[in-house]
Amino acid sequence: MSGTSLDGIDAVLAKIGPNGETVAEDAVSLPFQPELRKALFELQSPGANELHRDKQAGNALALAYADAVKQLLAKSKLQASDIAAIGAHGQTVRHQPQLGELAYTHQTLNPALLAEKTGITVIADFRSRDLAAGGHGAPLVPAFHAQQFSSTEDIAILNLGGIANLTLLPANGEVSGFDCGPGNILMDAWIYEHQGNTFDENGNWASQGKLNITLLKNLLADSFFSKAPPKSTGRDDFHLAWLQEKLGNENHPLEDVQATLLHLTAHSSLEALARHAPQTQTLIVCGGGARNTALINLLKSKSAEFFKHPLKITTSDTEGIDPQLVEGLAFAWLAWAHQQKRPANLPAVTGS
């Protein structure tokens, strides 16, 4: 798995039982080589020789995935023959679900090369069929969240990857979910632009700045936030150029922008949860953002602004799952579901 944040590759060894119960047996995380990260980042925007660059990057990503798989097998003392399949998501470089019958999504990857280099069956291209059926092709993880986290109380899962998405799991009711806005994507882009770091560790830089309320209101005025589900988003909508347009010609302190982006993620996530599932009792956070201490603390302190009752906020660690591994586990589970000929997209989530 490599997500929108472009921070690297997570490879998870998943043991899946006959009813879909899933356990992470082992994992490795590898940072992207700078050349590959640059190639994938540049594909996020139209440019010259795009088709050739996309195919080259897809091959390079397959080789990087293969290296991660081999390292995981060596760490786990397993052989390729011990593995039923690889669920490989690829790197999303375009996501255009709003184009009707011409809607498309594109995840750069050469799955054939990955299969050849590992000797393992590869299951990929998870999103296209859902778009063909009229859906958004995203988010896909709510079906897995329902498998892993369902409870006797009303809970929600907030996945804070590059994009933030919510899965709503009422104790008695239909599972639903949707993308709710930027997760780490803008904070990562801003700190990379100005400090060369790929992410803001623990939200330390954001913690040095102050919230700019006027800027926050300007960011929240984007039409995406007021759209009703089903909805999905990505780097097509939220990117550095979008942010710079919102900033205009004003000379904001850099750390204040980072602090405001932290508030944007927290505010948009809590507001969406309060609007669509005000009865939620527990919010479980996963994804890379779960390791951002400042973001978790902000979610906890701001929750009282949106909920009349105390909202318990925790991370998936409390459920025995490393927050960084949840999405990788989800795509292993989706690959298993495909092999079982079990539909794993949820029309109530994707709109298909």
Predicted regions and their residues:
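Glycine-rich phosphate-binding loops at beta-strand->alpha-helix junctions
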Residues: 93, 280-302
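Conserved ATP-utilizing enzyme core subdomain
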Residues: 4, 8-22, 27-32, 176-266, ...
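Short beta-strand-loop/turn "lid" adjacent to the catalytic site in phosphate-handling enzymes
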Residues: 48-109
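Phosphate-binding/catalytic loop of phosphoryl-transfer enzymes
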Residues: 97-105, 112, 116, 120-198
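Short glycine-aspartate micro-motif
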Residues: 1, 82-87, 155-159, 177
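Conserved non-catalytic scaffold segment of RNase H-like nuclease domains
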Residues: 23-60
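Glycine-rich phosphate-binding/hydrolytic loop that grips phosphoryl groups
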Residues: 6, 263, 314-352
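Phosphate/ATP-binding catalytic cores across multiple sugar-kinase/actin-like superfamilies
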Residues: 64-72, 254-279
